Amino acid sequence: MSVEKQTAMRRTFAIISHPDAGKTTLTEKLLLFGGAIQLAGTIKSRKAARHATSDWMELEKQRGISVTTSVMQFPYKDYLINLLDTPGHADFTEDTYRTLTAVDSALMVIDAAKGVEPRTIKLMEVCRLRHTPIMTFINKMDRDTRPSIELLDEIESILRIHCAPVTWPIGMGKYFKGIYHLIEDAIYLYQPGKHERVGESERIEGINNPELDKKLGDLASELRNEIELVKGASHPFEREGYLKGELTPIFFGSAINNFGVGELLDAFVKEAPPPQGRETNSRLVKPEEEKFSGFVFKIQANMDPGHRDRIAFLRIASGQYQKGMKAYHVRLKKEIQINNALTFMAGKRENAEEAWPGDIIGLHNHGTIQIGDTFTQGERFKFTGIPNFASELFRLVRLKDPLKQKALLKGLTQLSEEGATQLFRPLDSNELILGAVGLLQFDVVAYRLENEYNVKCVYESVNVVTARWVICDDKAVLERFNQEQSRNLAYDGGGHLTYLAPSRVNLEITMEKWPEIQFSETREH
């Protein structure tokens, strides 16, 4: 099959939401509908041995939150779906942001009782920057919810995106009876039930069908009136607005009861964009090009506790990956052979014989691959737009057992390569300072150092409030700056000079004093 045909049948997307909106449940249900798992392991019963398929890391299993991006591939009808599960927890913004550089569209999950929440607003800002097309699933309709019209108003006013309802709920909470599909003019009746089976919902054709009155009684005429109102007050779905990221189609349902998910998935494969072209520092790379290219957006250490491994996640941008092929590693300016790239089904890994644009493959990494690296078949361009963010929280790392220094350094280096934490080594001391965007990341590092590297540490507060990457083309100025400011300077894990500011005021004064130097909050990988 040609590159064009393989590309056309693929959909690569991420699910974004506030914690507890039901993202992990919906992820499982999509896998269930795609036939990728037989049994949706209700994620709340975490004490049982059955954990959510997409939360594979030990700490995630204990806490019940997704803290790293998981990658899952599954077929649905004539399509192949690549689903990237993003961390719902607020501390993992950076990992989530980079994941959103690797997808062509996103699915936003909103809790019908809570509406738009802070985390959703943050993630929408990222999607807006990239004009990412977004579909919306309003979840938990089987519980007491806010009025649906009110939810649409809130999405439009806070997230600044037009809403186009595709399905509309009939009742809510214990009176939830089903959904009306505005485009199909059909009603799907709700049957609360078997969490683990994909049940066929009873379908009634046409909103004016007398059968509806038999099934719903007075609710039928209420529904007709409400739909008239909804049609008058909302935007009709049009694909162009959706693809530009200006309009979001809205679906209602209950993920835990498998209801409304099939309608969402059908619309998704039909309307969501296939893999798109990608910008580089020299040209736009189109997916249908014959030559292979791709970029690394994530690195994960120790995915398999049985093997001390590091996997680099690469999004294929063009051409075809074939087992054993040679690829050019642009940053290192050298050719490598890729013998055993992996494909993923959330922690289950298989060797990939071939892969196509939109697919995510895992490369075994022995410390030579970094986030943001580009692989091609000889061309020397670099994919752009994969960011690193300055840390906002800092801890001094001290060993409980001084003989474990080597293991500590190895652990911190490998874990910081994943990009969720940053390791800083001050110029004028042997101390190790860990930086993060959120507090939970320190817990994750402490847990993983102890469990994966057998290293116990004490984490102490340190007099640093923020970090900035130092950029200066004038070598003489930079040398003078290094001498005068050495007590506040450190190298990050990638060897980049960083200013560790003891206070905001100090940073402002230093920036004023050194106008020739750029103090950057983000850095392209």
Swiss-Prot record:
CC terms in the record's Gene Ontology section? cytosol
- Gene Ontology annotations of biological process type: regulation of translational termination; translational termination
Q: Name one GO molecular function term.
A: GTP binding
Q: Which residues bind GTP?
A: 17-24, 85-89, 139-142
Where does the tr-type G domain start and stop, copy by copy? 8-276
Where it sits in the cell: the answer is: Cytoplasm
Query: Which keywords has UniProt assigned to this entry?
Result: Cytoplasm, GTP-binding, Nucleotide-binding, Protein biosynthesis
Gene3D superfamilies in the record, alphabetically?
P-loop containing nucleotide triphosphate hydrolases, Peptide chain release factor 3, domain III
In its keyword annotation, does this UniProt entry include ATP-binding? no
Report which superkingdom the organism of origin falls in.
Bacteria
> Pfam families given for it?
EF-G_D2, GTP_EFTU, RF3_C
As given in the record, the signal peptide range reads none
UniProt key word Cytoplasm: yes
Q: What is its main location?
A: cytoplasm
Q: Which family does it belong to?
A: Belongs to the TRAFAC class translation factor GTPase superfamily. Classic translation factor GTPase family. PrfC subfamily.
NCBIfam families assigned: prfC (TIGR00503), PRK00741.1 (NF001964), small_GTP (TIGR00231)
Q: What does this protein do?
A: Increases the formation of ribosomal termination complexes and stimulates activities of RF-1 and RF-2. It binds guanine nucleotides and has strong preference for UGA stop codons. It may interact directly with the ribosome. The stimulation of RF-1 and RF-2 is significantly reduced by GTP and GDP, but not by GMP.
HAMAP family for the chain? Rel_fac_3 (MF_00072)
This protein is called what? Peptide chain release factor 3
- The gene designation is prfC
